[in-house]
Amino acid sequence: MKEIIHNSWQNILSAEFEKPYYQELREFLKKEYQTQTIYPDMYHLFSALELTPFEEVKVVILGQDPYHGPNQAHGLSFSVQPGVKVPPSLANIYKELQADLGYQPVNHGFLESWAKQGVLLLNTVLTVRAGQAYSHRGKGWEQLTDVIIEKLNEREKPVVFILWGRPAQEKIKMIDTTRHVIIKSPHPSPLSAHRGFFGSRPFSQANAALERLGETPIDWQLPETV
């Protein structure tokens, strides 16, 4: 079988890649990429998994769909490619990071350094049509990303799940909260950030949890240039 992900996720998800729902998703995507503008590009579909192997995941930050504007999405939730304006939700994440840990916001939105330290930046749907939010919902991605959450839940080493907003928090029912750590608040979107995202201190909470678990905390300070 063709290797889809080039690390430990391949073995963990290989059974899923053989299932009818995933085959259907593949056919759907093949057509979409041929006839529409789809984000992210095909080579970045599984960036979140490529950058954060299964055994290295310490924290999961769950997003929903990729950004649907040009040059934004590159396979990591909330992150945008270098040289692209920081989107409103991410600007609010930076505000909270500053309030929580004192880190000055950087002028880019490229979160790869978090991913490389064990922060799985996972969207529940991994593709979208240009300019059409939610256009690839219900096509099979949710089934695959639910399995990713289930596999992490089954893992012996605990994970810190950061769940912003109602859709992300619906996943709590799949997580054994006696073993794993849940940090939740409203979504950082400008529509909801003032309802409790601001002041929620997710970054220091995540690091405190990691230290309790005997893990190295995340350096949430992003590099100034990328």
UniProtKB/Swiss-Prot annotation:
Catalytic site positions? D65
Q: Does the keyword Hydrolase apply?
A: yes
The GO molecular function terms of this record are: uracil DNA N-glycosylase activity
> Per the UniProt entry, what are the Gene Ontology biological process annotations, in alphabetical order?
base-excision repair, AP site formation via deaminated base removal
- Tell me its family: Belongs to the uracil-DNA glycosylase (UDG) superfamily. UNG family.
Function of the protein = Excises uracil residues from the DNA which can arise as a result of misincorporation of dUMP residues by DNA polymerase or due to deamination of cytosine.
Question: Can you name this protein?
Answer: Uracil-DNA glycosylase
Species of provenance: Enterococcus faecalis (strain ATCC 700802 / V583)
